[in-house]
């Protein structure tokens, strides 16, 4: 449990943006629904985003402090298709040594999101998402969905989306 926030600076008619995220969190107890453990930390990230004109690729670099109090950066590449389906890859490198991290030496993986719009007759913001990792260790772990969420949530109103679909701007 915890509290946090995100800011996004997205200049007009730009394909890039700067973001900042900070979260103060405390670990939940494994056996109690609302119990808390003694572990507390603050995660904080500065992010640089870029929307490529090439096949709807979004690139991101997040640098900051992770849940295990390690410091480093995550590189992320995501492609979003016209129907809302997206697939991406990420790699996180931190100050945790390969010997401390163990097998795999850094956090990496693939992820995808499938919107429910493809399966239901009405418009919905629902989706199913998953992350595929070879191994998951403490190093390089972030809070899920709390870094770069604004950048991806605002995709439909970003300049790169309007530029590609100019007819959306013309009233019928």
Task: Pin down the residues of each PLM region.
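Transmembrane beta-strand segments that form the barrel wall of outer-membrane beta-barrel proteins
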Residues: 1, 18-26, 30, 48, ...
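Outer-membrane beta-barrel domain signature
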Residues: 1, 31-37, 62-65, 99-101, ...
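Outer-envelope beta-barrel architecture signal
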Residues: 14-18, 55-59, 71, 81-85, ...
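Outer-membrane beta-barrel "beta-signal"
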Residues: 48, 105-172
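Residues that define the transmembrane beta-barrel architecture of outer-membrane proteins
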Residues: 3, 36-44, 69-73, 104-110
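Residues on the lipid-exposed face of transmembrane beta-strands in outer-membrane beta-barrel proteins
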Residues: 5-9, 46-50, 75-79, 110-114
């Amino acid at each position: 449990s915890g509290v946090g926030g995100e800011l996004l600076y997205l200049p007009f008619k730009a394909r890039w943006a700067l973001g900042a995220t900070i979260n103060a969190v405390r670990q939940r107890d494994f056996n109690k629904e609302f119990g808390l453990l003694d572990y507390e930390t603050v995660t904080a990230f500065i992010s640089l985003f870029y929307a490529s004109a090439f096949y709807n690729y979004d690139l991101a670099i997040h640098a900051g402090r992770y849940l295990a109090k390690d410091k480093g950066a995550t590189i992320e590449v995501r492609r979003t298709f016209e129907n809302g389906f997206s697939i991406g890859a990420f790699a996180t490198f931190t100050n945790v040594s390969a010997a401390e991290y163990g097998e795999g030496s850094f956090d990496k993986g693939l992820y995808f999101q499938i919107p429910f719009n493809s399966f239901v007759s009405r418009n919905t913001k629902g989706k199913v998402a998953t992350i595929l990792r070879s191994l998951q260790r403490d190093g390089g772990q972030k809070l899920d969905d709390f870094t770069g969420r604004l950048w991806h949530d605002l995709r439909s109103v970003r300049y790169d989306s309007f530029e590609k679909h100019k007819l959306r701007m013309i009233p019928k």
